[in-house]
Each structure stands twice: as C-alpha cells, then as structure tokens.
Amino acid sequence: MELNQVDIHYLIAAICVISSALIFYKIGVWGERLQRKLKFWHLIFFLLGLLADTVGTSLMEHIAELTHLHDEMHTVTGAIAILLMFVHALWAIWTYVKGTPIEKRHFNRFSIVVWCIWLIPYLIGVYLGMRLHV
C-alpha cells in the first residue's frame, strides 16, 4: 500500500522520535555501563528514552491504523520493549534512591539486557520501513 502525504509526515515524525529514543536510551545505558555506577543523569536519559519511545510508538500505531499495515511480531516485541523500559525506569529510580552501592554498581547488567531487547522491535521497524519503499 502506498503512503499519502499525511502518512509520510507521520512517518517522518515517528522515525525522528523513535530514533531519539534510541539515542537517549543508548546514552543512559552505556553511560551507566562506562561509569560503573547508576547516577541521576542516567535516570533522566532512561526516562527520556521511555517517553520518546512511547510517543513514537503511538505515532507508528496511528500510521498502522491509517494504512492498515500491521505486523504482529513488531507489535508484540514493541509492547514487550516498552513494558521492559517502564519496569527498567522504575527499578532504576528505586535502586538510585534506596539501593546499596553494590546494587548501583551492578544495575547496568539489567540495563544492557533491556537495551538489547529494545533493539529487536527497533530493527524490525527499520526492516519493515525499508521493505515499504522497495
């Protein structure tokens, strides 16, 4: 199915916002990994990534409704990723506020796993987007 001008604008906005989520989340996760301790600014980037991913996903959902282009695997993995990002953000806040120094040092293990899982729907979306234009 071909995208019209409105769909293209939604798609461009969604791609920008989802890519912002990738950048925010990557900075938070890898910043935490490199510094070997959970810090306040990592929480900010986790939350910015979650916010951008949620907004981008809602834009993508709107595009899917307009175009009737749905991919079940992308939908399921995307929902799992957002849920994990939400749990990750809550757990990060709890660990930052009440966690022991050891918990703050080891939190990055969970962050890396969540980030890797988040990449799955991101890459599926990239593949689906490229497939649309072939």
Task: Annotate each predicted stretch with a short phrase.
Residues 16-17, 24, 45, 52, ...:
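Hydrophobic residues within membrane-embedded alpha-helical segments of Major Facilitator Superfamily
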Residues 4-6, 30-37:
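Short, hydrophobic transmembrane alpha-helix segments
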